[in-house]
Amino acid sequence: MYIDALDIYYVRHSMIEPWTTAYGSDPDIYSVMVKMTSGSETAWSESTPLLAPTYSPESAFGTYYTVKEFLAPLVLHKDFSSAQEILQAMSVIKGNPFAHAAIEIAWWTMQSKLTKTPLHTMLGGSDDEVEVGADFGRQDSIDILLKRIDGAIADGFKRIKLKAMPGWDLEMLKAVRSTFPKHTFHIDCNSGYTLEDLPLFKEIDKLGLAMIEQPLFHADVIDHAKLQQQLDTPICLDESLSSPYMAEKAIELGACKYMNIKPGRCGGLYNSWKINELARQAGIGCWIGGMLESSVGAGICLELAAMPNMTYPNDLFPSSKYYTQEISKEPVVFSSPAKMKPSNACGNAFVPEEDRLAQRIIQHTHLE
């Protein structure tokens, strides 16, 4: 598949309310969108690091700059027959998985379009419905959180993820568990703790959570392995899994019992598929996470969630949860309570509407 042109967009999506985690609060979501042109066809990708390098070392503008200045020249006016080829062409640029993903995912959606093959089929998945969960960041009070959890359970969500951070952890969790003693919960710590917090995790270990997601340093697998050895509750790695290499090391060390896969953080769809395969072979279950993408990126994550070995409800959400207006004509919606269905479209299931994209553009680069 020959790449004739690339349009790279740095965009801002306004949220209904800020999203608060251990690393801060985000009132808007910033992302990089790439429109790839091959012949008369176009295909899209979205990669969504946050505004600041708080979740990972990448920022949204830094990703935009890396794509347009360094990665795009490596792939423009060239022909690639596989994802491995395009990743190899970009491999001279170290790290920066969100930037690599912006290009690589566009290759996948274009290949899906040109070969008339749904993306989930290319990734070895099916079009069966996938189960999704509910997530809650830090709330203004525990009472507000409990009311929201009650509503999510009534809506049919079988598992609920709670953001945890110093000052919003054990007391909150005890209140949740005493109110909902049998429901499935897990916490996402976003690297907010260290091994010195072992006494806290020993207390959390008594609460019967499904997992503790990324409790320690964002690039670590060694300390996570030490922590996992001392807890019955499974650890799930998120930020640490920036590549298949890191997944291999996590498996070797016994650093986790679950893996969260995000295509931006992993460097694209091939790496996401590879990490899932490594996990499957090791008997480790996976699930798909999100970065609060618009429908363009969320639709791609939904296709990933159709892969085998997705053993836990995914972090996929309807557009109405976060955005007053979606960038595409059609929003992301549930296919049935707490479930979503992959698209049988070839290429992108969701593409930006020109006027809605124009309202969100901060910077745009066209290369041909």
Residue ranges and their predicted role:
Residues 1-185, 191-195, 203-206, 326-368:
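N-terminal capping/lid subdomain adjacent to the active-site entrance of alpha/beta enzymes
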Residues 47, 214, 316:
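Active-site donor-binding loop signature of nucleotide-sugar glycosyltransferases
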Residues 97, 128-132, 156-158, 181-183, ...:
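Short, well-ordered coil/turn segments that N-cap beta-strands
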Residues 149, 170-177, 198-202, 221-225, ...:
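Generic structural signal for well-ordered alpha-helices
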Residues 158-166, 184-192, 209-218, 234-242, ...:
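Catalytic beta/alpha-barrel core
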Residues 177-179, 202-206, 225-230, 252:
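Histidine/acidic residue-rich metal-binding segments in metalloenzymes
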Residues 219-236, 241-339:
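Shared catalytic-loop signature of beta/alpha-barrel
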